[in-house]
Structures are given as structure tokens and as C-alpha cells.
A protein has these predicted regions:
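Short intrinsically disordered, low-complexity coil segments enriched in acidic
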Residues: 1-8, 117, 188, 222
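Betabetaalpha-Me/HNH-type nuclease active-site subdomain
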Residues: 52-197, 238-239, 243-246, 250
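C-terminal, well-folded lobe of enzymatic/effector domains
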Residues: 14-21, 28-31, 35-38, 65-70, ...
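A cross-family structural signal marking well-folded subdomains
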Residues: 1-95, 192, 197-199, 203, ...
Length: 255
């Protein structure tokens, strides 16, 4: 907070936004690295001095140095199933932050009520029957269940849609349910819609901003393992896309 107060004294919105986003990036890394907050407290005076002096370069360099000290632990925890299961709200932030950035950047979903959004696990989280049906025949259920809490297994749905598909498999959600349309069909939420048809929104043409964004971050429709199963390969590809987006937001390297 003192850093933002210092930035606000400059009466420069662009400067303030750059400082705020960089600080958000530092806090993001500290949260996922489980860094003790007194470490940041010791650096606040120096950070605020750079900000009050309108020295963006020194400020950014200082924050980058602090990030570099912790980023390895953060990156490990971002793909650690046990850590993510025990820190559900951190995972939730990642997915919602990516969704917010896409919507803001591309001006998508202005009519979507985001307070109706909830986190959805593509491999079902709370259904043993759903997990059993989702597991590939050449994989143990215990091993497959480790993917449930990975960030690449997460997307966003409306609360009403999420509550009705608890036992469903990824195939039923993404490809076809009972021979008809998939259960995610009809959603306008970009990171979920792209799973169905490869598009972030209802678009036409190949040079639109959403298509360029999709290509930039490789946000595309993913082929299922053996055309039927959501596997670690799809999870990793989705994580790579999400982490690339976050890397560009915060000016770090999360992949």
C-alpha cells in the first residue's frame, strides 16, 4: 500500500498502473513461493524512494531482483498438485486473473455477469464415479487423480452450469454429451469457449484481435488423448498458455 500511495503522488495514471502491475507481480510470486512478508517490509523504504522519485527503471530493476530470488519456488508450486490442492484460492486467482486479462484486452464478455462465475475442474473434482469414467484405460486412477488440482485442469463456468455436470467426463464436457452437443457448449467465457471450438469469442475472419491473441498464446482447441481422454498433455499445454499470459502481465518468466 505505501508503494501505491507513493505512485499516486505523481499524478500520472500510466506511471501508477505500471507500478501497481509490477507490485502485483511481486506479490503473486511471493504468495506462490510462500515468502515471508517481512522480507518485503525491509525493502519498502528503498522501493518507495524510487517511486516517489519517478524513477521507473530503478523501481522495476529492484522488483525484478526481488522476484528473481523467489521465482524458482513459485514456479515449482504452480505445478505441484498437492500444493495446489492445499491452496485452492491461489489456483482460483490464477484462472480468474487470466480470464480477466483476456476479457479486458480483447474487450470481450461485457454482458457477462462475472459474479456468477465459478471455478470448474475439467476432470471432475468431487465425483469418484466421474473420475473413474474420465480415467484412460492405460492409467491408474490414483495417478490420474493428481491432475485434478493442476491449473491446466481448471476453467470457468457459470454457477448454474457447473452444478449440473458434476459426474461428467471431459469428453462429455468438451466433445459430446449423449451424442449431442458438449456440456460446455453455449458458454461465452473465453478460456472455456476455446476448448469447444478453438475461438475466444464468436468471430469471423482470421485477422481479428482474438485470433491473434489466441495464436500468440497458443490458446486453441486441444485434441484429446485417443480422441476420448483429457490427459497430462492437455493440462500442460493449457498451463503453458496461462503462464505465458501471466508472464507478459507481470514481466516475468513463469514457463
Amino acid at each position: 500500500m505505501p508503494v501505491l500511495f507513493a505512485a499516486a503522488t505523481q499524478n500520472d495514471l500510466q506511471f501508477f498502473n505500471k507500478v501497481a502491475t509490477k507490485m502485483e507481480g511481486l506479490i503473486f510470486i511471493y504468495v506462490f513461493a510462500n515468502t515471508k512478508w517481512n522480507k518485503l517490509e525491509k525493502e519498502l523504504a528503498e522501493i518507495c524512494t524510487y517511486v516517489r522519485g519517478n524513477n521507473l527503471i530503478k523501481f522495476q530493476n529492484k522488483i525484478n531482483d526481488l522476484i528473481d530470488e523467489e521465482i524458482a519456488d513459485a514456479k515449482n508450486n504452480l505445478v505441484d498438485p498437492k500444493y495446489l490442492q492445499e491452496n485452492y484460492m491461489k489456483s482460483k486467482f490464477v484462472v480468474h486473473r487470466v480470464d480477466f486479462h483476456i476479457a479486458k484486452t480483447l474487450k470481450l464478455g461485457a454482458n457477462i455477469k462475472r459474479d456468477d462465475f465459478t471455478l470448474e475442474h475439467i476432470i471432475p473434482q468431487n465425483s469418484q464415479e466421474g473420475l473413474r469414467k474420465s480415467t484412460p484405460p492405460d492409467t491408474s486412477i490414483d495417478e490420474y487423480s493428481k491432475l485434478i488440482h493442476r491449473i491446466g485442469n481448471m476453467t470457468i463456468l457459470s454457477k448454474s452450469s457447473n452444478s449440473s455436470i458434476g459426474d461428467s467426463t471431459p469428453y462429455e464436457k468438451i466433445i459430446s454429451y449423449e451424442g449431442g452437443k458438449p456440456q460446455y457448449d453455449g458458454t461465452l467465457i473465453p478460456i472455456t469457449k476455446v476448448l469447444i471450438d478453438g475461438n475466444l469469442e464468436v468471430i469471423s475472419g482470421k485477422k481479428t484481435a482474438p485470433v491473434k491473441f489466441s495464436n500468440r498464446y497458443d490458446l486453441k482447441k486441444l485434441n484429446l488423448y485417443k480422441d476420448a481422454y483429457w490427459s497430462e498433455d492437455q493440462v500442460k499445454k493449457r498451463e503453458k498458455s496461462f503462464f505465458e499470459i501471466l508472464s507478459d502481465i507481470y514481466g516475468v518468466n513463469l514457463n
